[in-house]
């Protein structure tokens, strides 16, 4: 294994982990539990890759129909669907999932576990020169996109967990699964369009994703801060 390619694959992941960890400032999750979800994501990548390869054998489409099938079904549905299938029940059972921000933190760690193996596969399956280009492209575009999909999923899982209304809970559960699938599908669809203007569209799309999801993240960070200092004041009164 070439060290420089390995570092190219792993450094963006480590940056993502430190970044999202830094957002959990007041009631921090135990690192061992975050690593557990990271490893779950890495394990899921094997299952996801096998499922994607299987579905590609049923690809009988051409043109834009093929792009839709590959981006929304093979990539979006399988990757985000499998993550949600495992993440949601695992998170609901997680005893340290005590505030809304936690849903995002755990979701991103799981997604980064998946992205680690995916990065390795993409980078080490190419020739050296192409591997460097692939690694840089993924570090700048693909890894941040995975983080954004995970923030969306974690955001709605948290709304599902802490909502008292049953109808609302079902709605949030549905959104936790469907919205990341659609966001991922649109991302891959744009990525596969063979037009020069597609890269501009992709950059705009990623910027919009960042803006929307950073707002979601900030909302839960503010909620975490409010809860922390609220509990602190209650303890002082006692």
UniProtKB/Swiss-Prot annotation:
What keywords appear on the UniProt entry? Answer: Cell membrane, Hydrolase, Membrane, Protease, Transducer, Transmembrane, Transmembrane helix
Question: Which Gene Ontology BP annotations are present?
Answer: proteolysis; signal transduction
Q: Null phenotype?
A: Reduced expression of the extracytoplasmic function sigma factor genes csfT and csfU (5-fold in mutant in comparison to wild-type). Decreased virulence (30-fold less virulent than the wild-type).
Give the way it sits in the membrane: Multi-pass membrane protein
Membrane spanning residue stretches: 1-21, 31-51, 72-92, 104-124, 139-159, 173-193, 197-217
The reply to whether Cytoplasm figures as a keyword in the UniProt entry is no
- The chain's Cytoplasmic topological domains, given as residue ranges, are 22-30, 93-103, 160-172, 218-238
Chief site of localization: membrane
Q: What are the GO cellular component annotations?
A: plasma membrane
Q: Where in the cell is it found?
A: Cell membrane
Q: Which residues lie on this side of the membrane: Extracellular?
A: 52-71, 125-138, 194-196
Q: What is its EC number?
A: 3.4.-.-
Give the UniProt family note.
Belongs to the protease PrsW family.
Functional description taken from the UniProt entry: Involved in the degradation of specific anti-sigma factors, specifically RsiT. Involved in the regulation of extracytoplasmic function sigma factors expression. Seems to play a role in the resistance to antimicrobial peptides. Required for colonization or survival in the host cecum.
What PANTHER family does the record point to?
Answer: PROTEASE PRSW (PTHR36844:SF1)
Name of this chain's protein: Protease PrsW
Report the source organism.
Answer: Clostridioides difficile (strain 630)
């Amino acid at each position: 294994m070439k060290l420089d390619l390995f570092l190219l694959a792993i450094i963006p992941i480590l940056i993502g982990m430190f970044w999202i960890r830094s957002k959990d400032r007041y009631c921090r999750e135990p690192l061992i539990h975050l690593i557990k979800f990271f490893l779950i994501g890495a394990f899921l990548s094997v299952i996801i890759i096998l499922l994607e390869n299987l579905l590609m054998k049923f690809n009988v489409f051409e043109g834009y129909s093929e792009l839709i099938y590959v981006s929304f079904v093979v990539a979006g549905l399988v990757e985000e669907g499998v993550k949600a299938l495992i993440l949601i029940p695992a998170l609901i059972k997680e005893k340290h999932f005590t505030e809304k921000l936690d849903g995002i933190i755990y979701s991103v760690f799981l997604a980064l576990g998946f992205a680690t193996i995916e990065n390795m596969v993409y980078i080490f399956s190419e020739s050296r020169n192409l591997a460097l280009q692939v690694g840089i492209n993924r570090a700048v575009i693909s890894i941040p996109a995975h983080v954004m999909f995970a923030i969306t999923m974690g955001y709605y899982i948290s709304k599902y967990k802490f909502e008292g209304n049953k109808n609302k809970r079902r709605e949030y559960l549905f959104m936790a699964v469907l919205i990341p699938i659609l966001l991922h599908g649109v991302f891959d669809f744009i990525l596969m369009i063979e037009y020069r203007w597609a890269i501009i569209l992709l950059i705009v799309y990623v910027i919009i994703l960042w803006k929307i999801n950073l707002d979601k993240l900030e909302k839960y960070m503010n909620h975490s801060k409010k809860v922390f200092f609220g509990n602190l004041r209650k303890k002082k009164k006692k």
